[in-house]
Amino acid sequence: MSATRRVLVLQLCLMALSGCYCQGTLIESLESLKNYFNSSSMDAMEGKSLLLDIWRNWQKDGNTKILESQIISFYLRLFEVLKDNQAISNNISVIESHLITNFFSNSKAKKDAFMSIAKFEVNNPQIQHKAVNELIRVIHQLSPESSLRKRKRSRC
């Protein structure tokens, strides 16, 4: 197994273990995955972390939702690649279920919508046309003024 895969699995383990409420089956699945990729070895820990250093830097600013969504997307894509491996498929299912429960509020529809965005083909002219057409609304929704108005309305 490549060192990159080992590091990825280790990062997933650390993310999942950072919550004190982890279930026994989740911990067992993480340990099994870690053993499968031999992520406990020192070569998996060499150099910078894959995701955690970036995450820590974003946490200093207090705005991690965007980065969290990228990290979750990364792991879901990783699981998609690894799901056919019979030796670890059950462990991946347990971990993926945990991520869906915590990040997507246990909504498979939200997860599917989230993943569909990652699969858009940016070279497709029709996708480009629609994306540019929707861009002004997206920017408006993301602007600080828009969120400020939403907060003011919710207080009333």
From Swiss-Prot:
Summary of the tissues where the protein is detected: Released primarily from activated T lymphocytes.
Protein name: Interferon gamma
Residues modified as Pyrrolidone carboxylic acid: 23
PANTHER family given in the database record: INTERFERON GAMMA
GO molecular function, one term: cytokine activity
Compartment list: Secreted
Family: Belongs to the type II (or gamma) interferon family.
InterPro entries membership: 4_helix_cytokine-like_core (IPR009079), Interferon_gamma (IPR002069)
